[in-house]
Amino acid sequence: MDAPIDQPVLGSRRLSNYLVALLVSIGGVGFLLTSASSYFGRDFLPIGHPAELIWVPQGLVMGAYGVGAVLLSSYLWAVIAIDVGGGRNLFDRGADTITIERRGFRRLISFTLPCGDVQAVKVEVRDGLNPRRRLALRLRGRRDVPLTRVGEPIALAELERSGAELARYLNVPLEGV
């Protein structure tokens, strides 16, 4: 009996998301401190002289930008904390099931299907301005089920290796190579 294959899927906890959330947070706090410096007439930032800005309209607009950036960064940190899009793919030939799980904002999305419904493992590679490298299950009478994460393209060798391993495990052909 073959051991089940459990593939973790990386969601929003990627380095690029952490960097964007950090930069937006720093920028938002900077704008808020600039606005506060303008209002109170004291420099709260070590660079520049934001206390010299006129409160209306410059300090007020800086405060509005700061509030917007802090709200956006709060959303980004919440998405990272929840790990939206993360989950796992579990292939169990012993139980004849495939379980796909992904985290959403408010719930865990999970569905199970029998291994017999899989016609093939599909490798999709599209290069160009918006590259796409995706591994999917082709099902009988239904749409393809994507297995790989959204975002940065996976290395071609890793995609082919993973697709071939999965096709061998499920005893189905590998398409698109």
From Swiss-Prot:
Protein location: Cellular thylakoid membrane
Pfam families reported for this sequence: Ycf4
Phylogenetic placement of the source organism: Bacteria, Bacillati, Cyanobacteriota, Cyanophyceae, Synechococcales
Keywords, ordered alphabetically: Membrane, Photosynthesis, Thylakoid, Transmembrane, Transmembrane helix
Topology of this chain in the membrane: Multi-pass membrane protein
Transmembrane segments: 20-40, 60-80
Major localization listed first in the record, in broad terms: membrane
Any Gene Ontology biological process: photosynthesis
GO cellular component annotations of the record: photosystem I; plasma membrane-derived thylakoid membrane
The family this protein is said to belong to: Belongs to the Ycf4 family.
Role, per record: Seems to be required for the assembly of the photosystem I complex.
Organism field: Synechococcus sp. (strain RCC307)
Organism domain of life: Bacteria
InterPro entries, per database record: PSI_Ycf4_assembly
Name the UniProt record assigns to this protein: Photosystem I assembly protein Ycf4
